[in-house]
């Protein structure tokens, strides 16, 4: 019998008034028998929304456990006085309603807990370790449950003191007789760590004391441990440790857990009993401890920990500072589909201001995908009004596709990575870029070196290879093909192309018959092809970028025989403005050798021209004859992963020095100095730890302000390719750099970029960014001024409501301007004396409340009860918030929850939101066979305060005696892969950093993510979840 049929019978028999019925609709979730849709219909029919109370601890306190004074109170609607009409209910019905309401309570973090096919073994909420309980919460009565687990997850949400001990335990199992038999999840020097030891005292797992991810002292954190028993795929089992939802380290050494510790007797939070000693105590606030009966996946851990993900606080501009809104100059497609012009992706920005004041924005136009191969055109757009408006795209070159390619996704010769520069004397603008024959570019080069050029009678000619022959044919004057013995043939190569985008360059003719193209490599109809090598091409413009010359091959001028790869450091080159080499054009490039290629030989250098671009020369590499770890290296022979430097950006100081800012693998900024215009380099590379390098291209320019000399540098602030930063350095008299400011310029994804000075104290930046489903990447442009660079941004002093949004009938979302967390359910006090009650937390910034329809439009005066905490420890303010749609109640709603008529799941026609996997990409860890640096941890011997009547816990860090995890390879990005799979990694299964997807419901991009997706999901899924949770509790 359906819920609503029962409801009608009750109305007829008892003549209950509407208020009683509304309460039944609110609280009788467990009585639903026809599913969530019935409940939704009921809410619509009766004009009500279920009121959801704050969940208390999911288990009753242990019988032998002292109730702690620090426990948070549980706030429910039972605390309100009841209407007089409800006194007519019988005692049985009152008792039943009380039970119903108790079962209906849902977690304050319902969305984070909504996991499938998993059972809770132990759960403890809202406790503390402090002086009153000896810094320890005893859970020993749960030991038998733990011993039965073969696969498990231990998830803990906690807040340590800002000045916590060097080492403290979170959750542990230990023995009353054997001090070295235990399991502990702990924190060591703010690093989340882990240890398990058997009855013989031997370690189960690898070393976690130098794992990369740290907890935030004095703030809320989550640490999650998973263990999996041995299987065919995991012969020894696996353990993983996560911090705030992100995987910190994996160990495949053992899948042992509590069942493998026969003598353990104690289970505890905080101070740990090890035989006769109590150790590792600290003051902790524990929001939640949950043990599950299986290992959660990385995706599930991210979801369970979603409320603990936080970003840096958004700062405001100081007086006088200007940062324009971004303008998308080259806009990609969305959701994997091409844009209106058939282009899926744009990459590799290059920005140049010409002598006429025109801005030229250059890019890779990647038609099929964002990878570093396939159909890529070199394109530009021009602005003659300082970036306000932009002209149509102009294609410098785009070689034609192979119509019979074996793989169409890579079936084109490749042009990639552009550098723009203008000669101030001739006014000629140069575009220099890489070229590869059909294939995967730098990732598809031949393992065996093929000669690309042959010198004959003092002239250099390009070599052609003919199928089935070993001799070297050559392309000579007018494109005529010559045999290996120097005889002209009937074959002719197009060397002076005339078709649009010069797409016919490389076409091969026999007489007037087109046979194919010498740049094709698969299923080719041409009998010839060029060497599978890398090349450097140049185009130029003599009319301010409006039209461009056909590509010219400058490779033989600058590429030595030993170089496997030679490519540009994309962005903008410079012309030396003073010194003995004044007028010299400098273009950043980097090379690899045939010994170690991308794994150990990438080296930055300069190519230069002293005759206005007619001829080009290669300078020495920064790595040539440099001392590294006591050994002299050279770019032609080196095999040293850590010593590599790759794409770079170049500036000249007023004293004539040339500074090369290089992308590298040290995690910080590396700068080389040349005293001779970029031909040779000082042997010491200066490192600046104030500027992070997350192994991505950067851009730098030289500028003057009020007679003083400065460098402006822009790059991704990390932890991966995200959070664009502009850095300001003062140039000292000796040429050294003093870094003054580091200001954020773009939140979210941020990769390659290019800077230019625009004049009048204004600067421009063209950069890679994506949002709102854009493919990687869209190239966006912004302008900023000197005050933005040189002044500190203003930090927020409180967390406040940014906007409110009506999510459905009787439900409103409050979105804050920074991350918040609910521990004690807040009730909003309204100006009319009524209240709005807390439902649950939707994401890191959004809280859901129920409000009566007649109270919509009311202002919030404060909290009637409960609390909202800032994840950044700021005061939280709700006063003045208006309960209506829009920016803090002042802006009309853009989205409203539609009536749900489709199947359960996502609403409307929108696809489920795409989730992105976060990852840790910091400096720890290595690739290949090289061990990660071993970090030795000194034993802590300092004092600890006494807790209560118990002696102060002894600080004893877990002793690690097994194989150091530092000897195991971890993820490390080596070669730059600019496509959709943007990281090139060398990994082993033993230790790596997983990219787990964002579990929280993403908010649409408007600087911060807003609550539009709430609307698209609707309350349907929410109420369905509540029903499911209620049924689980009933069962």
UniProtKB/Swiss-Prot annotation:
Bias type Polar residues, positions: 61-92
BNR repeats: 381-392, 539-550, 607-618, 672-683
GO MF annotations, alphabetized: exo-alpha-sialidase activity
PROSITE patterns attached to this UniProt entry: GRAM_POS_ANCHORING
Membrane topology: Peptidoglycan-anchor
Alphabetical list of CDD domains matching this protein: Sialidase_non-viral
The EC number(s) this enzyme carries: 3.2.1.18
Short sequence motif named LPXTG sorting signal, residue ranges: 1003-1007
Protein name: Sialidase A
Source species of the chain: Streptococcus pneumoniae
Gene from which the chain derives: nanA
């Amino acid at each position: 019998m359906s819920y609503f049929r029962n409801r009608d019978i009750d109305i007829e028999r008892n003549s209950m008034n509407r208020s009683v019925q509304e309460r039944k609709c609110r609280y009788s979730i467990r009585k639903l028998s026809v599913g969530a849709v019935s409940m939704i219909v009921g809410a619509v029919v009766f004009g009500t929304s279920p009121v959801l109370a704050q969940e208390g601890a999911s288990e009753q306190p242990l019988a032998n456990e002292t109730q702690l004074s620090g426990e948070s109170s549980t706030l429910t609607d039972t605390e309100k006085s009841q209407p007089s009409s409800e006194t007519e209910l019988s005692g049985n019905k009152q008792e039943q309603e009380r039970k119903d309401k108790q079962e209906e309570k849902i977690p304050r973090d319902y969305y984070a807990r909504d996991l499938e096919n998993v059972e809770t073994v132990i759960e403890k909420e809202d406790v503390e370790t402090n002086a009153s309980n000896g810094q320890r919460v005893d859970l020993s009565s749960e030991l038998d449950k733990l011993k039965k687990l073969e696969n498990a997850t231990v998830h803990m949400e906690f807040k340590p003191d800002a000045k916590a001990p060097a080492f403290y335990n979170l959750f542990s199992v230990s023995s009353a007789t054997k001090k070295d038999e235990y399991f502990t999840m702990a924190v060591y020097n703010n690093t989340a760590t882990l240890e398990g030891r058997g009855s013989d005292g031997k370690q189960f797992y690898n070393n976690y004391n130098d794992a990369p991810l740290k907890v935030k002292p004095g703030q809320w954190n989550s640490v999650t441990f998973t263990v999996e028993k041995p299987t065919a795929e995991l012969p020894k089992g696996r353990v993983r440790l996560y911090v705030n939802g992100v995987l910190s380290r994996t160990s495949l050494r053992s899948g042992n857990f509590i069942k493998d510790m026969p003598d353990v007797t104690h289970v505890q939070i905080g101070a740990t009993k090890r035989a006769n000693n109590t150790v590792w105590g600290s003051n902790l606030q524990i929001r939640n401890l949950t043990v599950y009966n299986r290992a959660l996946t990385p995706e599930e851990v991210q979801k369970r920990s979603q409320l603990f993900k936080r970003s840096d606080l958004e700062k405001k501009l100081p007086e006088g500072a200007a940062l324009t809104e971004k303008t998308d100059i080259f806009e990609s497609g969305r959701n994997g589909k091409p844009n209106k012009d058939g282009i899926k992706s744009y990459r590799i920005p290059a920005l140049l201001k010409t002598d006429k004041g025109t801005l030229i924005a250059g890019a890779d136009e990647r038609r099929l995908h964002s990878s570093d191969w396939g159909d890529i055109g070199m394109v530009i757009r021009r602005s003659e009004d300082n970036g306000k408006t932009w002209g149509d795209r102009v294609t410098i070159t785009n070689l034609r596709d192979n119509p019979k390619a074996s793989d169409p996704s890579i079936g084109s010769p490749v042009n990639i990575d552009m550098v723009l520069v203008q000669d101030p004397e001739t006014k000629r603008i140069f575009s220099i870029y890489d070229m590869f024959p059909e294939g995967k570019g730098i990732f598809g080069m031949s393992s065996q070196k093929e000669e690309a050029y042959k010198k004959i009678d003092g002239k250099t000619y390009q070599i052609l290879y003919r199928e089935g022959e070993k001799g070297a044919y050559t392309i000579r004057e007018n494109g005529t093909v010559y045999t290996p013995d120097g005889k002209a043939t009937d074959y002719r190569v197009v060397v002076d192309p005339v078709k649009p985008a010069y797409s016919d360059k490389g076409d091969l003719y026999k007489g007037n018959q087109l046979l194919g193209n010498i740049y094709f490599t698969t299923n080719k109809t041409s009998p010839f092809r060029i060497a599978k090598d890398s090349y450097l091409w140049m185009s130029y413009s003599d009319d301010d970028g409006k039209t461009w010359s056909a590509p010219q091959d400058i490779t033989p001028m600058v590429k030595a025989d030993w170089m496997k790869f030679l490519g540009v450091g994309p962005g903008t080159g410079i012309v030396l403005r003073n010194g003995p080499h004044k007028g010299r054009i400098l273009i950043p490039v980097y090379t690899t050798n045939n010994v170690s290629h991308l794994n150990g030989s990438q080296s930055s250098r300069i190519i230069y021209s002293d005759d206005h671009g007619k001829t080009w020369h290669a300078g020495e590499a920064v790595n040539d004859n440099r001392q590294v770890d006591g050994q002299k290296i050279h770019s032609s022979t080196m095999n040293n992963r850590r010593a590599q430097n790759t794409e770079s950006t170049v500036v000249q100081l007023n004293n004539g020095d040339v500074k090369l800012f290089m992308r590298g693998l040290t995690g910080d900024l590396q700068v080389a100095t040349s005293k001779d215009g970029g031909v040779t380099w000082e042997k010491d590379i200066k490192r600046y730890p104030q500027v992070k390098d997350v192994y991505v291209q950067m851009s730098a320019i030289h500028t003057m302000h009020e007679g003083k000399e400065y460098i402006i540098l822009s790059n991704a602030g990390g932890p991966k390719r995200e959070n664009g930063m502009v850095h300001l350095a003062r140039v000292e008299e000796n040429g050294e750099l003093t870094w003054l400011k580091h200001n954020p310029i773009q939140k979210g994804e941020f990769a390659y970029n290019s800077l230019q000075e625009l004049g009048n104290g204004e600067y421009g930046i063209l950069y890679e960014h994506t949002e709102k489903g854009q493919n990687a990447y869209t190239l966006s442009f912004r302008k900023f001024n000197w005050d933005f660079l040189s002044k500190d941004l203003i930090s927020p002093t409180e967390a406040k409501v940014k906007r409110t949004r009506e999510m459905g009938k009787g439900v409103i979302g409050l979105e804050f301007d920074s991350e918040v967390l609910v521990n004690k359910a807040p009730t909003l006090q309204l100006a009319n004396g009524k209240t709005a009650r807390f439902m649950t937390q939707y994401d890191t910034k959004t809280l859901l409340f129920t409000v009566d329809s007649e109270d919509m439009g009311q202002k919030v005066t404060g909290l009637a009860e409960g609390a909202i905490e800032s994840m950044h420890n700021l005061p939280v303010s709700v006063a003045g918030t208006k309960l209506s749609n829009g920016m803090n109640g002042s802006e009309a709603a853009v989205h409203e929850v539609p009536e749900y008529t489709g199947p359960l799941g996502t609403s409307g026609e929108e696809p489920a939101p795409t989730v992105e996997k976060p990852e840790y990409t910091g400096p720890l860890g290595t690739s290949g066979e090289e061990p990660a640096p071993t970090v030795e941890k000194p034993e802590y011997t300092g004092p600890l305060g006494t807790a209560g009547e118990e002696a102060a816990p002894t600080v004893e860090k877990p002793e690690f005696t097994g194989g150091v995890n530092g000897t195991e390879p971890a993820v490390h990005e080596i070669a730059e892969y600019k496509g959709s799979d943007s990281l090139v990694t060398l990994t082993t299964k033993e230790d790596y950093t997983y990219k787990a997807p964002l579990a929280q419901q993403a908010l649409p991009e408007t600087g911060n993510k807003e609550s539009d997706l709430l609307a698209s999901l609707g309350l349907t899924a929410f109420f369905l979840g509540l029903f499911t949770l209620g049924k689980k509790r009933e069962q």
